[in-house]
Swiss-Prot record:
It catalyses: tRNA(Ala) + L-alanine + ATP = L-alanyl-tRNA(Ala) + AMP + diphosphate. It holds the Pfam family tRNA-synt_2c. The keyword Transit peptide applies. It comes from Populus trichocarpa. Catalyzes the attachment of alanine to tRNA(Ala) in a two-step reaction: alanine is first activated by ATP to form Ala-AMP and then transferred to the acceptor end of tRNA(Ala). Also edits incorrectly charged tRNA(Ala) via its editing domain. This is Alanine--tRNA ligase, chloroplastic/mitochondrial. Keywords: Aminoacyl-tRNA synthetase, ATP-binding, Chloroplast, Ligase, Metal-binding, Mitochondrion, Nucleotide-binding, Plastid, Protein biosynthesis, RNA-binding, Transit peptide, tRNA-binding, Zinc. Zn(2+) binds at H672, H676, C774, H778. Consists of three domains; the N-terminal catalytic domain, the editing domain and the C-terminal C-Ala domain. The editing domain removes incorrectly charged amino acids, while the C-Ala domain, along with tRNA(Ala), serves as a bridge to cooperatively bring together the editing and aminoacylation centers thus stimulating deacylation of misacylated tRNAs. The lineage of its organism: Eukaryota, Viridiplantae, Streptophyta, Embryophyta, Tracheophyta. GO terms for cellular component: chloroplast; cytosol; mitochondrion. Residues 1-29 are annotated as: Disordered. It is an enzyme of class 6 (ligase). NCBIfam families: alaS (TIGR00344).
């Protein structure tokens, strides 16, 4: 799907990028009903009104009037289609009828009673390589909308978890922007269309949820007369409250070509008293869009013309947080019961009253509440903090939450001051109706947050040191150029983006030292980042240029590879440089799509098969050969065979013989089954709580990442190897079954943390040893693995360890390579294999002796150099009794400088102050400060004095009052640094001596 528009301000990403407006300061009024109970049920606990709108009622309680309670009473509607899970729509007779949970449940019940299948939310990690994260409810149905996959049901309804970070800077500033939100949706796949979608949306809004009809406005595409007439003639919306809007706002497209159509949006009017004149639906102070209906009815052609689709679809999205805001009558989404308990927890940890806080403090609390929701659900879906891809999204959100909390003074209960886990506990507490798996994964989520926050605090401390260096350089440069000192926008952005430094803190620290901030330059860097983020989140498209045409002709690939390594298949499509072609000739790199294949496509950690495609004529003459070097999945289950035409010509429609390289497949099978055995062994040796965090199943090795807090001991690694080799020797037959996900979990099958599974799953079992959900290829008997060897164990991230190992043929190759290396080592050292360790130890001892001798010679040379420069010492103070020496010592290292300084202290005698600097290696600076007792006694310390000098050289350091060492990475600044040291010593010593 090429180039889907996803402007940040819309529920469904389909109307134009309107400029966000500041939330109104006025607050809606409430009617206090004295004859009713003074509390409301939220579905979790009975809470004070501050849960819903603390900014309105810092004290007291709020309840709904009787009439409104009756209007929002639970319906006894029977769904005609059974839901997937009871948790999605189970009746909650005691819940507040307008709680977030009740709204979600009632939405799903409403459409279930209209023959929609209630489907669970998809993972935040989409099954689509062209999209970073799940950003809309329609994403899990994208292959169906594109005609790439058959529909399983004609109608569906979901409550989809979504993540959007392309507008993260607006979070907390506006009333409605979020990184995590829920999109309630109803979908039709060639079943009902515009009339039903519009009427049901209106019925849901006005009858099910009781929204006043006179407060609802509608937007339609300017040329969509059909939608206009349905809204006006059949629903009864006055013409004055129906706005025709242009293509940018109300026409959804999937790219240059492909499925598209007009859309219609429902808006709630907070201020109907303003009338109809000059009304702008983009005015956030008055309106909020809460429901969006997309009518997919056209196919956009290459020439821009629109042709009617054979199958017309409905794709809708209703923002749960937005509707909750309306129904709960609070001034913004954050003060609904979906988010406010999290904000309340953050305020408690900061010892702040949200109700009495200023706007800036409230904004920061909203940021924390919003980001913690996104962080918890992302980690639950298997997205762990890292520096790339989805992991970087999580890491940035965590860092933004931490630095925002530090601004507010939020502190956890422990000695380390970590606070995110405490707030995340509240998110987990609220999670059962959003994602029931979150609570089960709570311990792992909290552990990951704890580790990441601690790591970031250390990063912040490094950032503080870097800021000090930047300010020192800015002051030095200003002194040279005789200009005002200024910190560049790039430096400020580096501190903000990499080290998590809020601009406010950078500005405050800089101003204390008389340094200004280049805010214009910083905004340029921020805008560049926004554009990159927007580009990353606006991509919901096929990976090929003419994806619309491809979608019409190619369907899911039938995988035959569990049962055979060769099969006859038909070429359905050829891609050359991303473009669909009819024919490809010899020498070309090509992507081949077949109707069926024995080739395994990369997934579940296992790499794709290698092999060949053969085209023959008359069952004998070979006319084309394609070497396949990789197989990937696209659009769900379309297998893309990537390779090179070695001979002949390949054409669309041609029948081919697809043959997998059997030897390489066997290597992959061996390593995949060995990976399952490794996970079982790890759980036995280090504990059942460890879990898989990633894997690679390759032809030459396997890699297994797992959650654990420390390196494994040699004895543990040996025990793991022995267990696995024992299971291999047992010669156990593997069992493979297909069953429901529920049955698999009840049977004890291990599911990959964060992996997305369908209703039916494949279970691979080594009886008595291992049972996992897995779609990969495996050996039939553990004896096929032959042998297993761990070749490395290391940490790759905080709390994540990695084991690399070999098995089968790769094990034999590894042992042979080790044997060859040992023979070469024995030959070089001229010893037997059993004598290598002793010989190496002897050589290392000899090396240490030689190094000590060299160091002693350098120290002597440094002392000699010191004796030559001692005469350059000069006296300061009124009595001229304090001797000062500041000199460069060429290329002596830190140890040699220390020897020289000690010699000079004895030679110059007390009182004396000595500063020495050198450049021992390219790109390095060494500094030493040595002060005799007489200098220390008058109030100057070497450890404190050397720090600012080292910063001028791009480094730092410190030490005792009488002796300190430092280093740096900017040798070109050494002369200026020593000059500053000389000047400062003269000023300080003269002042203190007098």
């Amino acid at each position: 799907m090429g180039g889907l528009k996803l402007p940040p301000q819309t529920l469904h990403g389909i109307h134009g990028g309107r400029r966000p407006l500041t939330a109104p300061s006025s607050k809606p009024s409430f009617t206090i009903q004295p004859n009713y109970s003074s509390s409301i049920s939220t579905g979790f606990t009975t809470r004070n009104v501050a849960l819903f709108s603390p900014s309105i009622f810092p004290c007291g309680y709020f309840i709904l009037g009787g009439a409104r309670e009756r209007r929002f009473g639970a319906r006894n509607t029977q769904a005609s289609v059974q839901p997937v899970t009871e948790e999605l729509v189970e009746d909650k007779t005691k819940e507040n009828p307008v709680s977030g949970d009740a709204i979600r449940r009632r939405f799903l019940e409403f459409y279930a009673s209209r023959s929609h299948k209630v489907l669970p939310s998809a993972s935040l990690v989409p099954d689509d390589p062209t999209v970073l994260l799940t950003i809309a409810g329609m994403l899990q149905f994208k292959p169906i909308f594109l005609g790439k996959a058959p529909r399983q049901v004609p109608r569906a309804t979901t409550a989809q978890k979504c993540i959007r970070t392309n507008d993260v800077e607006n979070v907390g500033r506006t009333t409605r922007h979020h990184t995590f939100f829920e999109m309630l949706g109803n979908f039709s796949f060639g079943d009902y269309f515009k009339k039903e979608a519009i009427k049901w949306a209106w019925e849901l809004s006005t009858k099910e949820f009781g929204l006043p009809a006179d407060r609802l406005w509608v937007s339609v595409y300017e040329d969509d007369d059909e939608a206009f007439e349905i809204w006006h003639d059949e629903v009864g919306v006055p013409v004055e409250r129906i706005k025709r809007m242009g293509e940018e706002d109300n026409f959804w497209t999937s790219g240059a070509t492909g499925p598209c159509g007009p859309c219609s949006e429902l808006y709630y009017d907070f201020h109907p008293e303003r009338g109809y004149k000059n009304t702008d639906l983009g005015d956030d102070s008055r309106f909020i869009e809460f429901y969006n209906l997309v009518f997919m009815q056209y196919n956009k052609m290459d020439d821009g013309s629109l042709e009617p689709l054979k199958q017309k679809n409905i794709d809708t999205g209703l923002g749960l947080e937005r509707l909750a805001r309306i129904l709960q009558k609070v001034p913004n989404n954050y003060e609904t019961d979906l988010i406010y308990p999290i904000i309340e927890k953050a305020a408690e940890l900061a010892n702040i009253s949200y109700a009495l806080a200023d706007d800036r403090t409230k904004m920061n609390l909203k940021i924390i509440g919003d980001h913690l929701r996104a962080i918890v659900y992302l980690i639950s879906d298997g997205v762990l903090p890292s520096n790339i891809g989805r992991g970087y999204v999580v890491r940035r959100l965590i860092r933004r939450a931490v630095r925002t909390g530090r601004l507010l003074g939020v502190k956890g209960g422990g000695e380390d001051g970590v606070f995110l886990p405490a707030i995340a506990e509240k998110v987990i507490e609220l999670s059962p109706h959003i994602d029931p798996d979150v609570k089960a994964r709570g311990h792992s989520i909290l552990d990951e947050l704890q580790r990441e926050e601690l790591r970031f605090v250390q990063t912040l401390e490094r950032g503080e040191k870097l800021l000090d260096q930047m300010l020192a350089e800015a002051l030095l440069n200003a002194q040279k150029s005789e200009t005002l000192p200024c910190l560049s926008g790039k430096d400020v952005f580096l501190l903000y983006d990499t080290f998590g430094f809020p601009v406010e803190i950078t500005t405050e620290v800089a101003e204390e030292q008389g340094v200004k901030i280049d805010m214009d330059g910083f905004e340029v860097e921020m805008e560049n980042q926004r554009r990159q983020s927007q580009a990353a989140h606006n991509v919901v498209k096929l990976a090929v240029e003419n994806g619309g045409d491809l979608a019409e002709n190619v369907h899911d690939t039938e995988f035959l590879g569990y049962d055979t390594l060769s099969a006859r298949a038909v070429v359905e499509s050829l891609l050359l440089n991303g473009k669909s072609v009819i024919q490809v000739s010899e020498g070309s790199e090509v992507e081949v799509l077949l109707n069926k294949t024995p080739f395994y496509a990369e997934s579940g950690g296992q790499i794709g098969d290698h092999g060949f495609l053969y085209v023959t004529q008359d069952q004998s003459k070979q006319t084309a050969v394609v070497e396949i070097k990789d197989v990937q999945k696209s659009l769900g289950s379309v297998f893309v065979h990537k390779g090179t035409i070695r001979e002949g010509v390949l054409e669309v429609g041609r029948e081919v013989e697809a043959a997998v390289d059997a030897k390489l497949r066997q290597r992959a099978k061996v390593h995949h089954t060995a990976t399952h055995l490794l996970q079982s062994a790890l759980k036995k040796v280090i504990g059942q709580e460890t879990s898989q965090a990633g894997s690679l199943v390759a032809f030459d090795r396997l890699r297994f990442d797992f959650n654990f807090h420390r390196p494994l001991h040699d004895s543990e690694l040996e025990e793991i190897e022995n267990l696995i080799n024992g299971w291999i020797g047992d010669g156990t037959l593997l069992q493979t079954k297909v069953m429901s996900l529920t049955d698999a979990k009840e049977a004890g099958a291990i599911a990959m943390f964060g992996e997305k599974y369908g209703e039916q799953v494949r279970v691979v079992e080594v009886p008595g040893v291992s049972m996992e959900l897995c779609g990969g290829t495996h050996v039939s008997n553990t004896s096929e693995i032959r042998a297993f060897k761990i070749i490395s164990e290391q940490g790759i991230a905080s709390g994540i360890r990695r084991i690399e190992a070999v098995a089968g043929e790769a094990f034999i190759e590894y042992i042979n390579a080790r044997d060859s290396q040992m023979k070469l080592l024995c030959s070089t050292l001229k010893v037997k294999a059993e004598e290598v360790t002793t010989r190496v130890d002897n050589l290392l001892e000899e090396l240490r002796t030689v190094r000590n001798e060299v160091s002693a010679l350098r120290a002597k040379a440094a002392v000699y150099k010191a004796s030559m420069i001692a005469s350059k010492a000069f006296s300061v103070g009124t009595s001229k009794t304090i001797r000062v020496l500041v000199e460069s010592m060429d290329d002596f290292d830190a140890d040699a400088l220390k020897s020289a300084a000690e010699y000079l202290m004895d030679t110059l005698q007390d009182p004396a102050a000595i500063i020495l600097g050198s450049c021992p290696d390219e790109g390095k600076v060494s500094l030493v400060a040595a002060f005799t007792p007489g200098v220390v006694d008058i109030g100057i310390q070497a450890g404190k004095f050397i720090g600012p000098i080292a910063k001028l050289c791009g480094g730092g350091g410190g030490g005792r009052p009488n002796f300190a060492q430092a280093g740096g990475r900017k040798p070109e600044n050494l002369t200026n640094a020593l000059e500053k040291a000389r000047t400062d010593l003269i000023l300080i010593l003269t002042e203190k001596a007098n």
